[in-house]
Each structure stands twice: as C-alpha cells, then as structure tokens.
Swiss-Prot record:
It is found in: Cell membrane. CDD domains: LTA_synthase. The keyword Transmembrane applies. InterPro entries: Alkaline_phosphatase_core_sf, LtaS-like, OpgB/LTA_synthase_biosynth, Sulfatase_N. GO terms for molecular function: transferase activity. It is a multi-pass membrane protein. This is Uncharacterized protein HI_1246.
Length: 647
C-alpha cells in the first residue's frame, strides 16, 4: 500500500504581518480609487490621477509601517509564544478595523468639510452626546451601515488572523536578532519615507491647488493620527509657516495698523494700546448675535440665495459690511475673533486651549471691569467646545444654556430653537434695563446646524425635504426678524448697539487651497442712531469688537489689533485659517497662502470665478502675512494677550 503524506507548508513568522499589510494596502487603494472617482472632476482639474495614486501608496506604506512595525519586531523575537500570538491577532485585527472604519467614515466627513477626517474628527469625539444625537437624527442609515460593515470586517479580520498565524515555522535564536534589526531598518525607512532632514508629512505629498485632492493622497487613519500628534505642538504651531524675530514681527504688525507708537502703552504687552471711543455719550449696551453657519451664500442682499428677507430689510436700516471675512471654519474660531479680536492660528481656537482659560483678554473682561453685566446666552449646552470654561474665566458673569429654558417651544439635537433663544435674550435684556445695568451679551444661535431641526409652520420652505441647510438658514433669518420685532419695541432698544454676524460659513470647501468664497460672511450693526450704509472695505471678524466698543462709547486699554472702523481707516486685509493653511487677502484681491513647511505662495483671487491664480506678490506682503500668522501663537505662548490689569 502506498501511503501519501501531505504536509502544509510552514510560513515565515512574519507571514501574518505581510498578509495584513497586503490586505490593508488593497483596502486603502480601493477606498482612494472610490473617493477619486467620486471627486473625479476635481482630480482631473489638477491633472492629479498619477500623483494621487503613486503618492497615495507611499503614504499607505508609511501608515502601515507605523502601525505594524512594532508587532513585526516583537513577532520576530517572540513568535514561539502562544501569548504573543494572541496579542498579535488582536493587534492585526483592531489595527485593520481602525483603518477600514476611518475609510468608511470618510465620505460623510468630506461631504460636510470637503476634506479627509482631520483634527475636527477628534474634537467632535469629545462630545459624544451631541455628535451621536446629530448622527441619529440626520444620518441614521449611514451610521447603521458603518456599524454593520465595521463589525463584519472585525469578524473577517479575526478569522483571517487565525488562519495567518497557523503553521508558522520557528526561527533560530541566532537568526532572530539579525531579522529583528532588518525589521527595524525597513520599518524606520518605510515610516520616514524620506532621506531629507525631515521625515514625510502631508505637506511633502501635497501637489495641487485643491486641498481636498491633496488630502485624498493620505489615508484617513494617518490623517487623524497626524492631527492628534499636532495637538502637543500647539503653542508653537504657527512656526510651521516659518520663523521671524519677535521684534521684526511686532514692527510689521504695528506698521500694518498705522497707529502712532505713542498709542502703545506697555513694554510687557506688545500689542496693548490706549483707545478712545468715537462716541462720547453715555456708554451703550452691546449685543452680539452670533449666527451659526450663516455665510454670505445665504444672504440675499450680499448676492446669496433668497433666504434672508428679514436680514435684507434690516440691512437697509443699519451698517452692512459687504466685504467681511471670517477667520476660520469653526464656531470657536468665530467666538475667538468676535469676543477677543484674536488672530487665527493653525492651533485650536483659544477657547479650547489651557493657557487661555483665565487671564485672556475678551471684551467681556473689559466691560465687566467697567461695570457692565456680561452674559453668554445659548440654546444648547454650555460645556460644548469648552465654552463655559473659557467664558467664566474671561469676564462673562452669567451663562444661560439649555437647562435654563422653561417649557421651550421646540427642542432639537443642538438645543432649543432660535426663537426660544431670542425670547430668553429679550427677557434678560428687558430685566437688566429695568435694573439700570449696562450689559454686554453674546447670543449664539444653533438651529442652522446639521441635522437642521426647527419648528414647523414658521417659514415657507425653500425646498423639500424640510430638514435642509437652506431651509434652516431661512428659519435662522426668520428668528432674527422675530427678535428685532421685540427689540425695537423694548425699553433697551435706544441704549443698545447690536451686531448680527456669522461665526463661519456652512460646508466650507472647494477646489482651491483656501476656498475664499466660503469665508465671506454677513456683518450688520444696528441700533438707534446708526446711520444706514453699505461698507465695501475689506475687513475681518477681528475688526468687529474694536468697532463695537467705539460705537458704544467704551474707551480703554486692550491688546486687540483689529481696526476701529468708525474712523477713517482701511484695514485692507483679511486673515483666513483653513485647517493648517492660512491665507491673507488684501483689498486688491492679492492673496498670500501659507502651508506647513512650505514657502509662502502668492495668488490673485478672482471673485467672479471664485478661483485663485498663481501670482508673484511682493516679499513685503509675504512678511506681513507671516508676521500676523506668528503673532497669535507668540502672544498665547507667552501669555501676553491681556489688558495688563489684575482682576
């Protein structure tokens, strides 16, 4: 009898690692292909197909070397251990699940932010209640699909890992150190992917003028981990744009302001100035109505969609800024600009940063010291985005949030409706006026936020279905009209300066390094004695708090570098932070764009076509852009953004 013995071929101890590297390379390449096909017009517009996939595979190898380099090393040394084999299976499975989960989450993130998941993805994870409520209300089917697919992937990966670790041949102990050294070298070179002074980073593989296409080169897992790693460097975040001596930085910033040196009153606080208000009567109340995501695209009188009949009418009664630009794309960036007049940086907004939780200048702090009641009125929960901590620590005496509303007319994912918010504001202001107390209040809306929930029957829908961005913007306008009907009949109307301003635009994105169109926002100052006018000067959100103080008759010392627009000045500049890219635009529409670890580039912005065209700009303009980009980080790091007074 002939007996045939068949034996399974024994695999290298590193076979499981190679298997999962190959699987993940395929998954990431297929995901990138799908995303590229989805965004094919934008990829083709920058002739990016070859670069996208060549550099994409390179970045995937980088990510996988980081992810599997350590287990590869430990497997080389301990593959004979049953305990290590179990740990290896878990590492391979959960590492791969993380990769595929991030890719599954990518289309929805791009749909909203026009970019692969980045630091915003991490920041939102801090607030699971709000985020999960939003997802459940507006994106339930996508959430269910993602969860089911991720669980299925986890099961499949676990089974594959079980198959991959079977029948591994043992490596002699003499050979193990040699192979381990080889693994270290290969993993290090693969992760670094460069023989230059710096290892690879997203800036090195950016090749186009379209920020989204550049982000497609990355994979979403790498993008998020890289963003998380950047958090620890926030104090010096702006240095990624270049370096400049502090004295030169302040010289350039001061020169751009055009103010005499005698206005600067402190050696310790370099931007601290004395400021005399234009209005010299009895100081007025100040109310900032900060509108969630209400960009110029939603305002008819600014050339946007016909969604704002109330703001359009109010614009005929007040001081409308036609050419004002937001400093960023997040609410906290808008808060930073409108309450502190602080320049943007690539770090998180100061609302979230540790060293700004007390002793950081805001106009609330200045006004509180001058006897004003200061408040923040919000329809959601005050802890979101760290707002309560920042406000309480920097001059805001009272905070009203969702728990303070008795029997609201409507409550959605992000809190009570804007009508409820404005009813609370009107009630609060009436009470304070009766008590004879001057007041400052920041009133922050939330109805114009995904999943776009607002009361029925309030507006004629612009489109179907009801829960759309455009309909929510129209409701936000309706609620503003509701507030001003009450305010004009109130006891506080004649004594108050109002500012309607957006925190940022909605769905900021586009086929350019910085989508300038989507930084254009409305700003409208109203109140008794405000002369109606349309102001075409190029201005920034950071010019609003200085202007409000002057209109209200509040003089004082403060470190804000924004212009007082009641005076005969022309700021002729706007600063825009788009993730880690910053733009400075001048009144002639010339733009300097600064990206991490790259030389500043000049462009011209064509408003009619909404495009950026490369252009040589003066070195002086590039230096001005760099000085302002570095300023915020320097002042924050050295705790120099203060009125110079002890509380």
């Amino acid at each position: 009898m002939l007996v045939v013995f068949t034996m399974k071929k024994a695999h290298s101890p590193l076979f499981p690692i190679f298997t999962f590297v190959l699987i993940n390379l395929i998954i990431l390449s297929l995901s990138r292909l799908g995303l590229a096909v989805w965004q094919s017009e934008r990829v083709s517009a920058v002739d990016g197909w070859l670069q996208l996939f060549l550099q994409g595979v390179r970045m995937d190898v980088v990510a996988l070397c980081y992810l599997f380099g350590v287990p590869a090393l430990l497997t080389t040394l301990f593959h004979s251990s049953k305990v290590w084999v179990k740990i290896l299976r878990l590492w391979l499975t959960f590492g791969s699940v993380f990769i595929i989960f991030m890719e599954i989450a990518t289309p929805a993130f791009i749909e909203t932010y026009d970019y692969r998941p980045n630091r915003l993805f991490i920041e939102y994870l801090i607030y699971p209640k709000e985020v999960f409520s939003m997802l459940a209300e507006g994106h339930l089917s996508a959430v269910i699909f993602s969860l089911v697919f991720t669980i299925l992937a986890a099961v499949i990966y676990w089974k594959i890992s079980g198959w991959a670790v079977k029948n591994l041949r043992s490596m002699s102990w003499k050979l193990r150190p040699v192979i381990a050294l080889l693994v270290i070298v290969v993993s290090f070179l693969g992760a670094r992917s460069s023989f230059q002074h710096r290892g690879i980073n997203p800036a090195m593989v950016a090749f186009s003028s379209d920020a989204l296409v550049n982000s497609l080169v990355l994979n979403s897992g790498y993008s998020v981990i890289y963003a998380a790693q950047q958090f620890k460097d926030e104090e010096k975040s702006s240095e990624m744009y270049g370096k400049m001596d502090a004295d030169e930085m302040f010289r350039i910033v001061k020169a751009s302001r055009g103010r005499p040196e005698s206005d600067y009153i402190s050696d310790k606080y370099p931007t601290l100035t004395k400021n005399v208000a234009t209005y010299q009567g009895k100081p007025k109340n100040i109310v900032i109505l900060l509108q969630e995501s209400l960009g110029a695209q939603f305002i008819g009188t600014l050339g946007g969609k016909p969604l704002s009949p109330n703001v359009d009418q109010l614009a005929k009664e007040g001081w409308l800024f036609e050419n004002l630009y937001a400093t960023g794309t997040r609410s906290v960036r808008g808060i930073e600009a409108t309450t502190a007049g602080f320049t943007p940086t690539p770090a998180r907004a100061v609302v979230k940063l540790n060293n700004a939780q007390s002793g950081f200048f805001t106009i609330a702090d200045l006004l509180h010291k001058q006897g004003y009641n200061t408040s923040f009125i919000y329809g959601g929960e005050k802890h979101f985005d760290n707002m309560a901590s920042f406000f309480y620590g920097n001059g805001f005496k009272d905070i009203w949030d969702q728990q303070d509303y008795q029997n609201p007319k409507f409550t959605g994912t992000w809190g009570v409706s804007d009508e409820d918010l404005f009813d609370k504001a009107n009630e609060t202001f009436t009470k304070l006026q009766n008590e004879g107390k001057p007041f400052f209040s920041l009133v922050f809306s939330s109805s114009n936020h995904d999943p776009f929930e607002y009361p029925d029957g309030k507006i004629e829908l612009y489109e179907q279905p009801k829960a759309t961005r455009n309909n929510a913007a129209k409701y936000a306008d309706y609620a503003l009209g509701h507030f001003f009907k009450m305010a004009k009949q109130s006891n506080y109307w004649k004594d108050t300066i109002f500012l309607i301003i957006a925190d940022h635009d909605s769905r900021v994105g586009g086929a350019s390094l910085v989508p300038i169109k989507h930084f254009h926002i409305p700003a409208l100052i109203l109140g008794d004695g405000i002369t109606p006018r349309r102001d075409s000067r190029l201005v920034s959100q950071i010019d609003m708090p200085t202007t409000l103080l002057s209109l209200a008759g509040v003089s004082g010392n403060y470190p804000m570098i924004g212009f007082d627009l009641t005076q005969d000045v022309n700021p002729d500049r706007a600063f825009m932070q788009y993730d880690q890219t910053q733009a400075m635009m001048k009144g002639n529409n010339d733009v300097v764009i600064q990206m991490p670890n790259k030389a500043a580039q000049g462009y011209h912005y064509d408003k009619s076509t909404e495009t950026l065209t490369p252009k040589d700009v003066p070195d002086a303009m590039k230096k001005e852009a760099l000085a302002h980009a570095l300023l915020g980080s320097y002042l924050y790091k050295n705790r120099l953004y203060s009125s110079g007074e002890n509380k």
